[in-house]
């Protein structure tokens, strides 16, 4: 069986529980994708793939369904430990070409920091495949302007979840791009 996804939706969640696995399950529930058998895949945003809302995407899911997703995931059982999970997205101006999704799951970064980093990763991967010249040592804001001014990258964004650990509990955060037929 092979297919190229035609739709994608983005979701995120956080879960807390005394058990590690249960904290992950609660994060999946918070993201509303707990009923699926998730298969993580690498980071290509398919050509002509339509972004849909979470609500619309959930209509396409059935309990037990094998569901492909790009997932960033992070967990901690340390009190006050800041964790985040981010999926960055970069889309080409030409919809017949593929884009990139990146996963970033750091400790000690805010949601904003983690999100910008993931978005930068995706945009940089796309820029290198499109032949856009840039200085990798420039900061993200400057490179973002170069990427978009080239006319080859039309959009970049991220979806990010962050949380701080709590005493005696596992905390898990996830961010996902859920790919649908």
Swiss-Prot record:
Cofactor: pyruvate
Signal sequence, start to end: none
Keyword Lyase part of the UniProt annotation: yes
Keywords: Decarboxylase, Lyase, Pyruvate
UniProt cofactor note: Binds 1 pyruvoyl group covalently per subunit.
EC number: 4.1.1.19
Stretches of the chain forming a coiled coil according to its record: none
InterPro entries: Pyr-dep_his/arg-deCO2ase, Pyr-dep_his/arg-deCO2ase_sand, Pyruvoyl-dep_arg_deCO2ase
Enzyme class name: lyase
Marked site positions, Cleavage (non-hydrolytic): 42-43
Record GO terms (molecular function): arginine decarboxylase activity
SUPFAM superfamilies on file: Pyruvoyl-dependent histidine and arginine decarboxylases (SSF56271)
Modified residues (Pyruvic acid (Ser)): 43
BP GO terms, sorted: arginine catabolic process
Classification via NCBIfam families: PRK12398.1, pyruvoyl-dependent arginine decarboxylase
HAMAP family, alphabetized: PvlArgDC (MF_01404)
Family: Belongs to the PdaD family.
UniProt-recorded name of the protein: Probable pyruvoyl-dependent arginine decarboxylase
Protein encoded by which gene: pdaD
């Amino acid at each position: 069986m092979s297919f190229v996804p035609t739709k994608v939706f983005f979701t995120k969640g956080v879960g807390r529980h005394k058990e590690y696995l249960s904290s992950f399950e609660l994060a999946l529930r918070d993201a509303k994708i707990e009923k699926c058998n998730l298969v993580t895949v690498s980071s290509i945003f398919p050509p002509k793939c339509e972004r849909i809302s979470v609500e619309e995407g959930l209509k396409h899911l059935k309990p037990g369904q094998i569901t492909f997703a790009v997932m960033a995931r992070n967990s901690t059982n340390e009190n006050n430990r800041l964790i985040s999970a981010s999926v960055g997205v970069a889309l080409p101006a030409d919809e017949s070409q593929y884009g990139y999704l990146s996963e970033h799951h750091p400790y000690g970064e805010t949601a904003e920091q983690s999100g910008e980093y993931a978005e930068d990763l995706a945009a940089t991967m796309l820029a290198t495949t499109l032949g856009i010249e840039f200085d990798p040592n420039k900061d993200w804001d400057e490179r973002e302007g170069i990427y978009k001014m080239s006319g080859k990258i039309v959009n970049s964004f991220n979806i990010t979840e962050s949380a701080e650990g709590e005493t005696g509990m596992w905390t898990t955060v996830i961010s996902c791009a859920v790919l649908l037929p």
